[in-house]
Structures are given as C-alpha cells and as structure tokens.
Amino acid sequence: SSAASDVYKRQAGKRTVNRKSFNFLIVTRIMLSNLKKYQLILASNSPRRKELMSGLGVEYVVRTLPDVDESYPETLVGAAIPEYISRKKADAYRSMMKPGELLITADTIVWLEGKVLGKPEGREGAVEMLRALSGKSHQVFTGVCLTTTEWQKSFTAASDVLFDVLSEDEIQYYVDRYQPMDKAGAYGVQEWIGYIGVKSISGSFYNIMGLPIQKLYGELKKL
C-alpha cells in the first residue's frame, strides 16, 4: 500500500551502528569487504535483533512495515515454519527495494512437543506457556532470509533448550516483572528466567534470542 511505502521511505536514512565499537567496526568492514556494494536493511523492530546486528559491527538501516502477514500453511512443521515466514516477510518489502539494498528478515518460533509456541496473547497466555515449558526440553527455530532485487536465499538455525522445573511463584514473578508478551514462547533467554530456569542449551544461544548471528555472519561472508 502507499501508506506502507511512505513508512518504508521515511525510515530509509536511519542508520544504526554500535558507535562505542568503532575499531571493531573497521575490522568487521575489512572482513566483510564484500558488503560494500550493499546497504544492509534489518526488517525488524525487535530490540534483541537490533542488539545482535550492532554487535556484529556492521552499519545497517532498520525499516519495518505495519501488519505484515505471518500466516503459514498448516502442513509445515518445525524449522520450515519460520523459514517460510521469513521469506514471506521479505516478499512484503520486495517491491519497494532498490538495487544495492540487502534486506534481512527473520522469524523465530518455539517448538514444544510438535506444537508452535508463538508470542503469547496477554498475561495469562504467557503464564500458560511457561507452565508448559517447565521441566521439559523444547526447540527454538529461526528462519532468516536475505533478499536483494536480484536474488533471495534463506536458511534456518535450531537450538535445544531444557528448562528446570519452574515454581508458580517464579513464573508469576517473571511475567509480571518482564512482560514477555513480545517473545516467542513467552521468555527471553537473556533475562532472569534464563538465569534461573534454563538448565542446558545445545546450539546457538543467540538463535534463542532471535537471530543466529554466527550463521548470519557466515552467510554474509559468502556473498
């Protein structure tokens, strides 16, 4: 829509960079010298994804569109779901992209016993999700899509997370204090609940935060 396009254009000049790590930025530019021909665009308002991109030491622009459709076919399971959604998010931006732009879209889900735990609907939804995760192992899948006006490629990352048994008081405290309604599975592994509740992790910690940054770095080096 024209309204969405206007929002996209207004965001075009807003560069984001970790200013405190200037020397690190210079080194990263050398290692990712192949990216000079691209303007990186992160299509996400997630504070975690912004933090991870800044930690990578690259300059990027944040651009978002309202109400991007994140539905997916019911036949998809596991890692195929966020990969499909990440590509669908990219397709929503594609008509507005210019040559030389490299769009990064991502989607993360929590996969528990064959079911998706997305973002909870309200406080009680968050409490119910944490009760379901308590004392069990689950998977976190992230799909990432890289898109230009000429090509598109996507990949996935998976992490296994084992939660200790959470008391009702711990669940209630976390939900009230941290308001995790914007997080898949109703928890942030980097927050208090991760300190006291996560017993073990197999795979990328940063994938659980929402962006498998090491894998993304590897893919960017290949361009």
Task: Give the ranges of each region predicted by the language model.
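Short hydrophobic targeting helices and cationic amphipathic motifs
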Residues: 19, 24-25
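A short beta-strand-loop structural module common to alpha/beta enzyme folds
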Residues: 60-71
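Short, small-residue-biased leader/transition segments that mark boundaries at the very start
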Residues: 1-8
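Anionic-ligand binding patches
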Residues: 32-41, 76-223
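Cofactor-binding loop segments of dinucleotide-utilizing enzymes, especially the Rossmann-like FAD-
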Residues: 45, 65, 149
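Short Gly/charged-rich anion-binding patches and loops
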Residues: 3, 47-48, 215
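N-terminal beta1-alpha1 ligand-phosphate binding loop
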Residues: 32-58
